[in-house]
From Swiss-Prot:
Organism: Salmonella typhi
Subcellular location: Bacterial microcompartment
Signal peptide span: none
Any one of the GO BP annotations: ethanolamine catabolic process
Gene name as annotated: eutC
GO molecular function: cobalamin binding; ethanolamine ammonia-lyase activity
Protein name: Ethanolamine ammonia-lyase small subunit
Length: 298
């Protein structure tokens, strides 16, 4: 699927939902233009906030032959370029920023979704067989199964036999869920309903792994299960969300190749609203073809 197809899907889904169709971006931000970022700086300072835009735009190459080229390169990407060297080693500020980003990623994995968050969103909360974060990180197999209490809650409080069941889970990034939820779930649910699909009761699974959607789909009798789960964070990027969609999942027979994945959903990747439109189109095609993953025809 190329960019033009994605844009057409977004326009058609947003229009059917009665929302404003995204307008073409201004020339300054069209393809070929340089992304906006803080002005590059070459000053090394221990007082600089290592998570700030200024620190990310820092240029560590001393006495460059073509400073304008480095400035242009630094403005064009969020990658770790132009950091310079001190002999064979990285500059102090480059190393400190690397360590800070690594620490931020570890914090994201270890953080918990606040208990009040699910209540504030009006979501039913269930959990896997996992009881705490340490067990979640060391026993991924238990994160693939619902607790007995969760199974009872789904059977008593959720719509049975829906066309599409949407599930939200913290996964390995709490920030991915809390930062993107309001921009992806409401338009996703609205788009699915606008498409005439029977949508199940959305709910939140604490300590869930991707394969838990197989058990959920089997219990609820869902034709399509869509799992929105936090991705393992990268350095300096802790808000990336993934969508795993599967048709008619079964615990015993569904394999990873049966899933269709849309990853890198965040403001610096695929915008959540755009991802919602693409997921709606994906769910419709899954129901039409009665397939997902590698079994779908393009």
């Amino acid at each position: 699927m190329d960019q033009k197809q994605i844009e057409e899907i977004v326009r058609s889904v947003m229009a059917s939902m009665g929302q404003d169709v995204p307008q073409p971006v201004a020339p300054s931000t069209q393809e070929g233009a340089k992304p906006q970022c803080a002005a590059p700086t070459v000053t090394e300072s221990c007082a600089l906030d290592l998570g700030s835009a200024e620190a990310k735009a820092w240029i560590g190459v001393e006495n460059p032959h073509r400073a304008d080229v480095l400035t242009e390169l630094r403005r064009s990407t969020a990658a770790r370029v132009c950091t310079g060297r001190a002999g064979p080693r990285p500059r102090t500020q480059a190393l400190l920023r690397f360590l800070a980003d690594h620490s931020r990623s570890k914090d994201t994995v270890l953080k918990e979704v606040p208990e009040e968050w699910g209540k504030a969103q009006g979501l039913l909360e269930v959990r896997s067989e996992i009881s705490d974060k340490n067990l979640y990180l060391t026993r991924p197999d238990m994160g693939r199964r619902l607790s007995p209490e969760a199974i009872d809650a789904l059977k008593s409080q959720c719509v049975m036999n829906p066309d599409v069941q949407v599930v939200v889970s913290d996964g390995l990034s709490t920030d991915a869920i809390t930062a993107n939820y309001e921009e992806i779930l409401p338009p996703l649910l609205a788009g699915l309903k606008q498409a005439g699909l029977n949508v199940g009761t959305p709910f939140f699974v604490r300590y869930g792994r991707v394969k838990i959607e197989d058990q959920i789909g089997e219990i609820l009798g869902a034709k399509v299960v869509i799992l929105l789960v936090g991705e393992r964070p990268g350095l300096g990027q802790s808000e990336s969300l993934s969508c795993y969609a599967v048709y008619s999942p079964r615990v015993a027979t569904t394999v990873e190749a049966d899933r269709t994945c849309i990853s890198n959903i965040h403001q610096g990747g695929t915008p959540p609203v755009e991802a919602a439109a693409v997921i709606v189109d994906l769910a419709k095609r899954m129901l039409e073809q009665k397939a997902s993953g590698i079994n779908m025809t393009r």
